Amino acid sequence: MLRRLLERPCTLALLVGSQLAVMMYLSLGGFRSLSALFGRDPGPTFDYSHPHDVYSNLSHLPGAPGAAGAPLAQVLPDCPERSPFLVGPVSVSFSPVPSLAEIVERNPRVESGGRYRPAGCEPRSRTAIIVPHRAREHHLRLLLYHLHPFLQRQQLAYGIYVIHQAGNGTFNRAKLLNVGVREALRDEEWDCLFLHDVDLLPENDHNLYVCDPRGPRHVAVAMNKFGYSLPYPQYFGGVSALTPDQYLKMNGFPNEYWGWGGEDDDIATRVRLAGMKISRPPTSVGHYKMVKHRGDKGNEENPHRFDLLVRTQNSWTQDGMNSLTYRLLARELGPLYTNITADIGTDPRGPRAPSGPRYPPGSSQAFRQEMLQRRPPARPGPLPTANHTAPHGSH
C-alpha cells in the first residue's frame, strides 16, 4: 500500500514540495523560532572576534563636542526604542588601568554624581546603576571607563552609585545593594535599578540597561568565567535589573549574608516566592568579561549560607528592606559617580562554624534545586514603599 502511494507522481511531488518548504522556512529564520519553542532563543548573531572600541560613535551623539546640537523645541521627542548609535560587541581590556582624570576627559557630558541625560530626545528609561564596593579601586576605574560610553550610546538617563562598605569587617554585598537602592530612590524616582558587580564589564551594547515591567531581569547570562553560559538555570548573580516596585515586592535583598556565596540563590528564591519570574536577554547579547582577581580578605566563603537558604521561604518577608539599618557616613558627588559610604555593622555570628545541618562539598547545586522547588508560603502583608524611612537613628 505504502509502496504504491510512493510510486504515484502526485505523492512524490507533495513530498518534494514539503521538503523544499521546510528548507525555505529554516533558511528564513524558522530555526530561531523552533529554538524559542524548545529551548533558549540564542538571539541574533554577533561577531565577537572583531569588537568595536568602547568609545565608538560617542562623538556622533547629539550635544557631543563637534556634533549637531539639541533642537531648541521645548518638547523633545522620545528617544528611539533602540538607539541608532549602538555598535554591538565592544572591546574589553584590563590594562592599562585608566586614571579617573582620563575617564573624566573622555566623558565630557557626564555631570556631577555620574549623571547623564541624552540631548535631543526624551529618554525612555531613567536607570540607576548601583555598585557594591570595597578595596577594588582598579576594578572600579575599569568599570567606569567602560560603562559610561556604553550607556551613553543607549540614550538612557542614568546615574552611577558606588556603595562603599566602611571598615574592615566581613563584606556584605546584598546589604550594600539595599543601602544603594534606598539612597538612590531618595534622589530620584528611577524607572530601573541595575545591581552591578564591580568586576563585570558588558561586551555588547545591544544589552540594554532597561527593566522588564513583567519581572526581574538577570542580565549577565554569558560570562567568560562560566564559558559564556549559565552555570545553572536559577543563577541570578553578577548583574540584575528590577523596577523599584519589583524590588520592594520581594522585600529587596537579604541582609544576613556576610561573606561570599548564598545571597544570589536567596534572591532567586525571593523572586519566585513573590510571584514573579526571571527574564533574560539572549545568550548572544548578555556577554560579560570578569576582571581577574584573587580572593578578597574579608570576603571569604560564607559558612552559614546553606543554613540561611533553608530559612528563606520563612524569612524573606522579615529580612530585607523592611529590616535594613545602617549609618550613612558620607555622600559625595564625584565627577563620575555618587559615592555612598555606609557603616552596615558586622556579622553578629562571627567566623565560628555554623550550627545545624552541614552539607558536603559539591552539594550546592542539588541544594539550590531543592530550595527553589519548595512551595511558597502565604502571601505576606504590604512591604515598604520607595519613600519608606529608616528607623530613628539609622538610615
UniProtKB/Swiss-Prot annotation:
The keyword Glycoprotein applies. GO terms for biological process: carbohydrate metabolic process; galactosylceramide biosynthetic process; glycosylation; protein glycosylation. GO terms for cellular component: cytosol; Golgi apparatus; Golgi cisterna membrane. The keyword Transferase applies. Mn(2+) binds at residues 199, 293. Residues 341-395 are annotated as: Disordered. UDP-alpha-D-galactose binds at residues 132-136, 171-173, 198-199, 228, 260, 293-295. Gene3D superfamilies: Spore Coat Polysaccharide Biosynthesis Protein SpsA, Chain A (3.90.550.10). It is found in: Golgi apparatus, Golgi stack membrane. Pfam families: Glyco_transf_7C, Glyco_transf_7N. It is a single-pass type II membrane protein. Its cofactor is Mn(2+). Responsible for the synthesis of complex-type N-linked oligosaccharides in many glycoproteins as well as the carbohydrate moieties of glycolipids. This is Beta-1,4-galactosyltransferase 3. The lineage of its organism: Eukaryota, Metazoa, Chordata, Craniata, Vertebrata. The gene is B4galt3.
